[in-house]
Every structure is written in C-alpha cells, then in structure tokens.
Amino acid sequence: ARIFNTYGPGMALNDGRAISNFIIQALQNKPITMHGDGKQTRSFCYVKDTASGLIELMNSDLQGPVNIGNPDEIQLIELAEQIIDLTDSTSEIVHQDSAVDDPRRRCPDISQAIGQLAWSPQVDRQTGLERTIEYIKEKLCEQ
C-alpha cells in the first residue's frame, strides 16, 4: 500500500505536518506558518478511511502497490483558511521560504482501489478537520 497524508485523532501533535501545525497555531491564535506561496496542493485522508482502505487491501488478493488516500486536493493556503474558520481563530498567515524539494502537487490516483477493492474515502475534509480539531484541543488541555 502507498499511504497518502493521513490525519485525524491519534496523530502526533509535533511531527511537523501541515494539519497538526495549522490547528495548533490557530487554536493558540498564533501566526500560521506557510512555506512558500501556499498554492501548492495536497490531499489528506482521514484516519478511519485510511484504515478501511488498508483492511480492504489486506482482505483482497491484490498484488503490488495500491494507493490509499483521498484525491480531493486543496491548496495549503485554503486549508489554513479553513482551519482558521473552523477554530474561530484570529491567526494570520505568515509566509516563509519554500521547503527544499517541496512538490507543487501531491494527489493520489486511487482508481485501482476504487475499481478492484470497491474502496474510496468516505469522510469529507470538513468533518475530518472538525474531529481532529476536537482531538487536538483535548491534547493541548492535557499538557
């Protein structure tokens, strides 16, 4: 399996990934740090969808690499704006230099998973972000 940008409850808060970084910064009303212009796209797959895709793959006879992810792309600047909105944050977006070797686009082709596993992600980004925000709020309160 090739797994693409999984997020959701249980994710590490300090691993440097966009979703956890943006949510923590937004909840703390700190500037959201954006590498580059923010127009690079990514796709994010909610953890339960990733798990269900892996289970379908394990229960199949399919051989070779299969992409497990969500093909719903979003520009990182739009993701940051959505998180600011969902957290009622006063954070502003601050641009920094682009990361070295940062691809402009990252989106899985999941046609094999759809066609041969009858699998596709079910949790939309807004719902997944809302659940993840609640999880991160709880974790920050524990610290």
Q: At which residue positions do the language-model features occur?
A:
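C-terminal substrate-binding subdomain of Rossmann-fold SDR/epimerase-dehydratase oxidoreductases
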Residues: N5, P9, I24-Q143
